[in-house]
Amino acid sequence: MLRVRCLRGGSRGAEAVHYIGSRLGGSLTGWVQRTFQSTQAATASSQNSCAAEDKATHPLPKDCPVSSYNEWDPLEEVIVGRAENACVPPFTVEVKANTYEKYWPFYQKNGGLYFPKDHLKKAVAEVEEMCNILSMEGVTVKRPDPIDWSLKYKTPDFESTGLYSAMPRDILMVVGNEIIEAPMAWRSRFFEYRAYRSIIKDYFHRGAKWTTAPKPTMADELYDQDYPIHSVEDRHKLAAQGKFVTTEFEPCFDAADFIRAGRDIFAQRSQVTNYLGIEWMRRHLAPDYRVHIISFKDPNPMHIDATFNIIGPGLVLSNPDRPCHQIDLFKKAGWTIVTPPTPVIPDDHPLWMSSKWLSMNVLMLDEKRVMVDANEVPIQKMFEKLGISTIKVNIRNANSLGGGFHCWTCDVRRRGTLQSYFD
């Protein structure tokens, strides 16, 4: 990624001239060189004013509103999503590959319409209660702007309606003092970032770094139109080969396919995150952070945090139904691998966009406090045995929209420093 500031002067500016010139070709190298020289001269003549400007507009790191390096440091500020105006996505190939067959008639009938009104009302109430409890626990809560997701839109490559702003974890990732907007992979989520822009602009004005990953065209070439939807066996074989409904046509990823542990960040190739997307993130975060690809026995991977949820330094929840192929990496580092109990959510409860394993999709308020579903008594007891106090909140109707506490939130600021847990 090229930054404008690389041409302001100094050795980095000179390196940028050489690089940009080589990429553009000899005919434009002279123009780049002249631009660099004039910029360098202007920078030298106004060095004092630039220094004063930098001091005025760039707060010290301790003043930055965005700062989070892992999933468990003491939580100070969080973004919580909205269920209001949530719409059923059109039943396209990428949606079909990420949903259970028993719900396909629901999508075929309701695609482009609002989710059932009564259910949304209950979900809204649950999330409001979650926000109230977070506030009582001393956490600052931010909410995305309300948007009507039923509006149709069209790009040169596709047309769609929207989905929701319920799951900030899917679209936003905080790494240190930087907030990264993920490009997403569902066409119904193309404009989801708009709900968060007022929040992110405020963070930016107050000193946070703000990066938007390359936006995919989401043209037909991004999706395998012949992906074997019905055959679980075929999907297992393809998953083992690293092949999913999204192709490598262009980078795409959801932020929820990454999970942080200080300098080490773990990512999975999934139905919505491709290798190009992971590679973009790896290059962008290097050399301060190391991005590792891990995989699971899962024919339908989408988002890592209901499969592999890191809840403390050296402590991870690992889904017994989707074992991690690289689990020895964590065992050799001395980590404790905890297998969560089977969820107790009833079979007849609608889970239009997820599995029952949202029970392990928990939010850590710090190493000794966890927000957990009030109905999931077995996992509450598991946490208590680990010496972790549970903050019980009913979120079952909100689960139906595809996420648990971790999905419904994006931790913006945690009180802690960057550390390595694998050296």
UniProtKB/Swiss-Prot annotation:
It is an enzyme of class 2 (transferase). GO terms for molecular function: amidinotransferase activity; glycine amidinotransferase activity. Arginine binds at residues 170, 305, 322, 354-355. It is found in: Mitochondrion inner membrane. Its main location: mitochondrion. The active site is at 254, 303, 407 (amidino-cysteine intermediate). The keyword NAD does not apply. InterPro entries: AmidinoTrfase (IPR033195). Pathway: Amine and polyamine biosynthesis; creatine biosynthesis; creatine from L-arginine and glycine: step 1/2. It comes from the Eukaryota. Highly expressed in the kidney and pancreas, especially in the proximal tubules of the kidney, and alpha cells of the pancreatic islets (at protein level). Moderately expressed in liver hepatocytes (at protein level). Expressed in the kidney, pancreas, liver, colon, ileum, jejunum, heart and skeletal muscle. In reproductive tissues, expressed in the testis, epididymis, ovary, oviduct and uterus. Expressed throughout the brain in neurons, astrocytes and oligodendrocytes. In 12.5 dpc embryos, it is expressed in the middle part of the somites, hepatic primordium and wall of the dorsal aorta. The modification Phosphoserine is found at residues 46, 49. It catalyses: L-arginine + glycine = guanidinoacetate + L-ornithine; 4-aminobutanoate + L-arginine = 4-guanidinobutanoate + L-ornithine; beta-alanine + L-arginine = 3-guanidinopropanoate + L-ornithine; taurine + L-arginine = taurocyamine + L-ornithine. Residues 1-43 form a transit peptide. GO terms for biological process: creatine biosynthetic process; creatine metabolic process; embryonic liver development; kidney development; learning or memory; muscle atrophy; positive regulation of cold-induced thermogenesis; response to flavonoid. Induction: Expression is induced by growth hormone and repressed by dietary intake of creatine. Keywords: Acetylation, Membrane, Mitochondrion, Mitochondrion inner membrane, Phosphoprotein, Transferase, Transit peptide. Signal peptide: none annotated. GO terms for cellular component: cytosol; mitochondrial inner membrane; mitochondrial intermembrane space; mitochondrion. Its EC number is 2.1.4.1. The modification N6-acetyllysine is found at residue 385. Homodimer. Belongs to the amidinotransferase family. Transamidinase that catalyzes the transfer of the amidino group of L-arginine onto the amino moiety of acceptor metabolites such as glycine, beta-alanine, gamma-aminobutyric acid (GABA) and taurine yielding the corresponding guanidine derivatives. Catalyzes the rate-limiting step of creatine biosynthesis, namely the transfer of the amidino group from L-arginine to glycine to generate guanidinoacetate, which is then methylated by GAMT to form creatine. Provides creatine as a source for ATP generation in tissues with high energy demands, in particular skeletal muscle, heart and brain. This is Glycine amidinotransferase, mitochondrial. It comes from Rattus norvegicus. The lineage of its organism: Eukaryota, Metazoa, Chordata, Craniata, Vertebrata.
